[in-house]
Design a protein with these regions (language model features):
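The feature captures the beta-strand-to-loop junction immediately N-terminal to the Walker
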Residues: 35-37
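Helix-to-loop junction immediately C-terminal to a conserved catalytic motif
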Residues: 50
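Conserved structural motif at the start of ABC-family nucleotide-binding domains
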Residues: 3, 18-19
């Protein structure tokens, strides 16, 4: 399966274009990095790929077809700030089971403690909350996963644990993974190739990955 963006252009109202003629393709067996500093439209591109917003020009195709949102989006997006991605009026068990019920093995692998399931989002730390958001996105229906600065705000141990689970799951389930970050050292470690938005979409092939 392939997720493809063709000639994506986007600007906010009368501002200048933050995305101009972006072309990107990701296969279901790939890990592709998107590298750029703040202000280059990384998150906007992520939202377009996931169907949250529409480009001013261009299109996003899933297996050659215009991507249509169904009951569950096959392209899942994980944001940098997990507190903005959950319903504060729901307890964590309901949030986690919104799309599917993950196995006890997956819950344990993600480092989620059972007592957290009965807590409110406000009672968890950012790292604890992000574990739930990541696991929620790893549904059997997910075909492509977009990680937008997914672990930037987390400590090194939590980062390593989350990436280990995500990469293993994506490989085992043939899920395409798009890693969006300003941190090239992270992309060098986890990606097959990197697209640099700052350098005219220059592509770099990475030989050594986790």
């Amino acid at each position: 399966m392939q997720l493809k963006a063709e000639y994506i252009n986007f600007k906010y109202k009368k501002d200048k274009y933050i995305l101009k003629d972006i072309n990107l393709s990701v296969n279901s067996d790939e890990i592709v990095g998107i590298l750029a500093p703040s202000g280059f439209g990384k998150t906007t591109l992520a939202k377009i790929l996931a169907g949250y917003i529409k480009p001013e020009k261009g299109k996003v195709l899933l297996e050659g077809q215009n991507k249509i949102k169904k009951l569950f989006n096959p392209v899942q997006l994980i944001f940098q700030h997990p507190e903005k991605s959950v319903n504060p009026k729901w307890k964590m068990k309901k949030i986690l089971n919104e799309a599917y019920e993950p196995s006890d093995q997956m819950i344990e692998a993600m480092g989620i403690k059972k007592e957290w399931l009965n807590r409110w989002p406000s009672e968890l730390s950012g790292g604890e909350l992000q574990r739930f958001c990541v696991l929620r996105a790893l549904s059997p229906h997910t075909k492509f996963l977009i990680a937008d600065e997914m672990t930037t705000m987390l400590d090194a141990i939590t980062q390593a644990q989350i990436w280990k689970v995500v990469i293993k799951y994506c490989k085992e389930n043939n899920i395409g993974l798009i890693v969006i970050s300003h941190d090239k050292s992270l992309l060098d470690k986890v990606c097959h190739r990197i697209v640099n938005l700052e350098e005219n979409h220059k592509e770099e092939i990475i030989e050594n990955i986790i």
